[in-house]
């Protein structure tokens, strides 16, 4: 993310033919400038249909404003289809702001000064530079990033990533013609769930006990319960968008979140763009029949299964096979026989083909919390000991729950039909 590669500031007028590099940079800046009004218009229309975000439109007191030149970045930490994430090395405030805003900026400045290589605290997220040559993609991705920042500023839950700063000029920051003109500053996570599950699959002995994984699932459910209470659908729940910070779960990458109409019921279906990663996408999205908050419930069932079974369902399926075998024929992952019956029943209900049959996140969080409390070794050991079971049987009983394994349904049998 070298700023020298994408010059900031006003275009320089030259006589005669412009040099190819300068001409390309000018075209990129011009394209970004032209799309600012389009982005702002799209966001205004979106907010007019979002009671929760509209009610949170006042400037949040917990988000600091920065100019891009005030932030020094380090290594590239990751990239998605439309955005990049960089580590923040330093924050050097050089523009004056109101007292309250200046205090926030100073707090982040001091935090960056005191952090060491093992305690990085902040990241910046902005668009990828390639989008400057793709006007439609740039416009859509820019609007999604601005909306994500607004959602994060309005939301407050311990299992949703925290926003600490953003571009001082809001969406107008795209007008400087650079891909990183608008950005968000977020807390830096320690790891992501997909990476941890991959490590656990390679080395099962490194996996945390079942009760701890159930605790993670309960935290994810709590974050979704909170979003759904605001009528917000996540739309892109997957293990790649779930992280860890100081041992706790964080949902992140909220760019595809949308707010459903305030007076909608759980049976109302909405035609929105089909988004998400196939393995986690609800059948109704793939089949184009409309969807609602129940789509998140289906996605959570697959995340939950992957987390608890340490197995990746439908791993060998392409999108065509997923549509035919899972969405049309109703294939689902194979449950682990040693799991409690109430957990198996809950998962089965969450991935039901009919959205209206799936439980709400309120119900799911409540049931998972109860299952988790029963699964803790202390609770089970105490119960069995009170019933005068021999210590050897107590150890066997409390260890068996976390030792269950799963045989994931793969594509081989289906392909041979």
Where are these regions (language model features)?
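Short beta-strand micro-motifs within the conserved protein kinase catalytic domain, predominantly
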Residues: 162-180
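Conserved short submotifs of the Hanks-type protein kinase catalytic core
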Residues: 175-192
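Activation segment signature within eukaryotic-like protein kinase domains
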Residues: 216-217
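Catalytic-loop of the protein kinase fold
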Residues: 228-244
